[in-house]
C-alpha cells in the first residue's frame, strides 16, 4: 500500500467513491462473458463518463466504447479513445458540427446511428463534403419503443435507403433490449426475443443482398442470458454486445438483476450532520448528489417501501438503516428498529457509504470520482461528460 495516498477520511463530502477491486472485477467479468460467447464487447460508458475507466475497459478486452450522445464522443476522443460508437441517432447543425470535429481527428474510428432517412441524409452531406464514407448502423426497435425502426421488412427497407446514400458506409444493425419482467426467466425471455428479432432481420438483409455484417445486441440486465445464448451458437450472426451499467452497478440494476449487491462499485460518501432526532440522522447529501430516481417502476417488488417511503439508495453494511427522505442538499437516514441499541446509533460526524439508486444520475452530477482501495484513494477519475463541449458552428 502506498502510505502517501490520501486516506478516505480526507475526502470532502459529499463525494462519489468507486471501489477499485469491484470495478476491476466487473470489467474482467464482462470481458470474460463476451470472450466465451465469441463476440466483441463494446461497453456503453454512460454510467461513468470517465475516459480513464473506459481505458481500463479497453485494456481489459473491449474493442472500443459506446456513448449515448455525440457530445460524449467528443469528450472520449479528446482523451485518446480511438474507436467510438454513438448509440443515439442525432440531428441538427450543432450535432453535425461536433461530428465534423470528430471526423477531423486522425486515427479515430467513429460509427454513427440512424433510424430515419432525414438523420442519414444530413450525415451523408457531411461525408460527401469530407470525401469519405461515414460508418453507420441502423437502430432497430425490438420492444424498447424509444429509438428504432421495426425489425424485419421495415428495417430492410430503411437499410436499402441508407445504402444508396453517398458519404455513408452502411455497416449493419443495432438492437438495445429494455424492459422485461425482473426475474431470471424474464431476462432469459427478453434476451431471446431481442436476439431472435435481430438475427431474423440480419438474415433478411443478407437475403436481399444488403451489405452489413455488424449485428449488435445487449443490455446489462440481459448480459448473462445473451452470452449464454451466443455461447450455445444459436445466433452466429451476432457480432457484438454493448452492456454498460454493470461496469459500476447501482440499486436499479440490482433490482433489474444486472448486478449482485456486492458488485456495486460506486457509493456516495456522506457525513452525518445532525443526530438530534432519535428516529433518524441527517446527512450532507441530497438529490443534488444522488439524483431523484426512486425506482418507482419496481414498487410492486417486496421491500420497496418502508413506512410508506421508497429509498434513495442502500447503506453499505447497515441493513437496519433506511435512506428514505431526501431534499435538495440533505437527506434523512432512518432507523428501521423502533429503539436501536446505543452501539447501532450514528453520531454526528460519522460517515456512511450509500449505493445510489441510479449511478448514472449520481456520477453525471460530479466533476470527479474517487477510486479507492484498502481505505485510501488510489486515483481520481475526471467525469469528462461534465465539460462544456459547445463547438463553434
PLM feature segments, named:
Residues 1-18:
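Generic N-terminal amphipathic, Lys/Arg-enriched alpha-helix
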Residues 279, 283-393:
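C-terminal accessory subdomain/extension
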